[in-house]
């Protein structure tokens, strides 16, 4: 028959079972982490039955006596159960069915996975995580705390939920969600009222609430840090289900949330037992709703009782009031004495068996002092240290925090060291160890639609982000959220609990990519990161790295220094409240502006080098902040970085990230962004939508605003100018006594009224000629600026006379760099070679060429205050020198870019898209670019990958026609200097010789 019975397909024979002790009040539920503490010898005898099956068992039994070999049947049962109900982890595990009291003749329990165990002293701590409900068949041993192999029937909720109709699925979502929302509001109201009643200025009725033992018990439970963290996670999960689909997966998620909620809340043992024994999922949801309503009724009863006592209290005189208060104090003292006298419970044979967490044992003097302590914050630190091992903190951190707490408990409260250590613990308790916000179900269509709605264009960026979303959807193994038992049972956790982190679970975590968005200011790099955080359901944190010059800003200061604090990365985790947020490292190129070896770098460290560990997926799971002092796991943090220029960044840092270039927008794209995004935003921000007027701009007005009033790669200036137009319209509306409706169109003639006169157009400067200057020797080149934008440069060459030695000399000015000066030398040699070999000639006589060879020339590039460098001006300089030699002017609407060689080859250059955008804005009519940049032009012409491949395969160069229509100017390729000359003077006959004679043939 196999391991699973054929009648229901869920019965497992010979499954290890453990009958819980009656007085433990433990009701195991799926998804909850429990710590079982039993006598060591007895516990080792039980765990010895599973020796060799799981790493946790073998680790706990190290050094213990030999045990019998595990029966093959038990190992086979474990393997079969894992494959069917816990297949997410391939590591062999141990499972035990925790059995509770019998109800209606049936024993029901929860199958749990043994995740950790540790022996210390005479006790053994066993950590168990509930997985699924199960019904145990007869017979069941009569003695408690006994282990036996019995027949269990697994209650698989998925099989029953699969038979539900739409009405039941909707009830599952609405029932759990509605009950949770009401209870969440009720808990918030109760804690707020209780806190206000503790203040000195509260009225008498409010103070009476603190005298209720039930109110104090509830407030103590709700104010525990473990409960607050777990409840916050549940609240986040429930908010994610607000708009969830009415399907089977949502219903299963709601059942899991119900289990976690009942386990977290201070419900009674009878309520938890009733909830555990609800086999039918539909009945379980009804039970959940009823229990939540009962807890709300408890709050209402407390409020009504407080009001009743207050009304009766006011009718008594001062003596009666004093007697009532004295009775309260006397009862409290008697209760404290009883706690001190109580001994820990023992099972048969004097063996201590208990479930943790529970109050500290009465035979411990330190525990008694702690119970009587008035320092609630110190008690909170003690509780945190006791529970630190189940929070996923690194082993080094666990050891260090326990050592620091022992030191803290021995220090005087007034000492400086005490205050420093207290501040340190306050910060550590704020780090959200073990808290991961689960990624909601990924809808690729909705995600793509959101990215398109938030950003215009950016095709490559959206493509890469959708690839990452597909990986997440396929893997679907982001860290889950489970509540630990420290937030479930009453009392404080024990420092004996130790969790051995499962290595296989660590390996299943999806490695997140590190994306570096590079582009000019204002193109949407930061807003893209925000949109991705919304799509992934991750909390967003932004860290501005501009001006950071100290390594301690990243790694933190060592806490021995006065005023020490943690670094930006750990602080971002604290603000996010989880260990898997999306952190944006903004302007990462600015943090590396200090040259290597500079004084500041030596004194304060290199913050760029500190980022190497943060952005390395092989290292950041053990990132160490100097203030924290132990490794912090950053492996599930999604880092986005932005930069304007990569030239100042170190290669190792860039190599750790995937670089995505975001280019500047064309003016058509800017108009589309302004019309569909920016103008509606400004209308909304300035409340112009309340006027009922439909504001718009004409096409000519849009073009004028984009071309004349804003010269940038991004759209920030455009946003400001549109805001000025909207505010101007608001002034008109107010001056017209708040009257007006219908459409209001801003024309090109209206723009100076709102924006003033446009800045003087650079286009006029570069195209106009002077009356006394020669027209030849002037060529327009294209440049790529450090801010990611393009520009148009003017290369002017004039003949200032004959040189002294009758040889051609060229003087350069205009703040030219080394590479650009070398391009001038290369261009000079090339032109001299072509003219000397008569490859190019001007007329029948060569007087102009002869004059050129003995000339003293001067080459100048205007705007001398701006440094200029790079190889892409070689083609333009060569054409300018040839224009001077031949005395042939070049069309002022022509612009050139490309690196020139001594053989006349024109090599590809970078920033072609930005250069063409600049040429378009300056009104150029023809742009000549290297043939090697065809891929760049194809990407500029089309966004679709398939269309790009088709264009590249077409020898007719169809992308040039597309670009002419898109940019409004002609674009042509140039492979060598000959192509450049023929495009510059297309009407000149016989300007370039075919040169069949090898003695004069140019080596091209």
Curated annotation (Swiss-Prot):
Subcellular locations according to the entry: Peroxisome matrix
All residue ranges annotated as the Lon N-terminal domain in the record: 15-296
Class in the EC hierarchy, top level: hydrolase
Keywords: ATP-binding, Hydrolase, Nucleotide-binding, Peroxisome, Protease, Serine protease
InterPro entries found in the cross-reference section: AAA+_ATPase, ATPase_AAA_core, Lon_lid, Lon_proteolytic, Lon_Prtase, Lon_prtase_N, Lonp2_euk, P-loop_NTPase
Keyword rRNA-binding tagged: no
CDD domains found in the cross-reference section: RecA-like_Lon
GO biological process, one term: protein targeting to peroxisome
Source superkingdom: Eukaryota
Binding-site positions, ATP: 519-526
Location of the Lon proteolytic domain: 773-987
Predominant location: other
An example Gene Ontology CC term for this record: peroxisomal matrix
HAMAP family for the chain: lonp2_euk
Task performed by this protein: ATP-dependent serine protease that mediates the selective degradation of misfolded and unassembled polypeptides in the peroxisomal matrix. Necessary for type 2 peroxisome targeting signal (PTS2)-containing protein processing and facilitates peroxisome matrix protein import.
UniProt protein name: Lon protease homolog 2, peroxisomal
Organism: Eremothecium gossypii (strain ATCC 10895 / CBS 109.51 / FGSC 9923 / NRRL Y-1056) (Yeast)
